[in-house]
Amino acid sequence: MIKKIIAAGLLLTIAITSTFATDQLSIRIPDIKQIIPPPPSPGTLLYQNDMDISHASFFVKNTNRYKLAQSDANYSPEGFAQAFEKAFGHSISKKETPAIWNILNQLEVAEGEFTKPAKLFYHRTRPFAYFHEKACVKTDNIHRSYPSGHTTIGWAIALTLSEINPSRTDQIMKRGYEFGQSRVVCGVHYPSDVNAGYLVGSIMFSQLQTSPEFQREIELAKQEILK
């Protein structure tokens, strides 16, 4: 699969060529910094909440929840499929569900375009680095904590899969929420990073809804789970 991103102003163009389709997907990217609040400032209750919860997260190692956070850290279509297919109620793979797989790739590309400017602007240090602890997985870019990119894509995936299979919305959205919380358990994000990620994920999904090409992919995906 070949992916190419052409950014012009606030317009993102994602070109994806696969065995089943060649689509040109264009969506507008709003300035996320103008929408979400900045990270909590030191001395505020929200900041103290971030510190308290994140510090406590380093004491839940060797638990099932910690192991789930490690698994959820797999940032790839394979990882997303593994995280969501049980809640989705249908297996997800490049071979069996190529349209859904293509959507996961599109979301992965789009997430970086939506979150990277804010991450670079706020330059927030991740919890494991701040507290001199070890994260549940090896993590680079220690100053890109806000907002959470994993949460953004996890929430957007949950919204998208719920549109494809609405009969499983309860299970899918619960899993999407857990996917975000895994970032706190992992020690790589503060609660406010994750909360911002849920919002950015919703914004990203709303922008994708304006794309006729994306809607056509959704319709193909709906047909896949009927087979």
Give a label for each model feature:
Residues A8-A15:
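Bacterial N-terminal signal peptides
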Residues T19-A21:
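Boundary at the C-terminal end of the N-terminal hydrophobic targeting segment
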Residues D23-C186, T210:
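Hydrophobic alpha-helical bundle signature of multipass membrane enzymes
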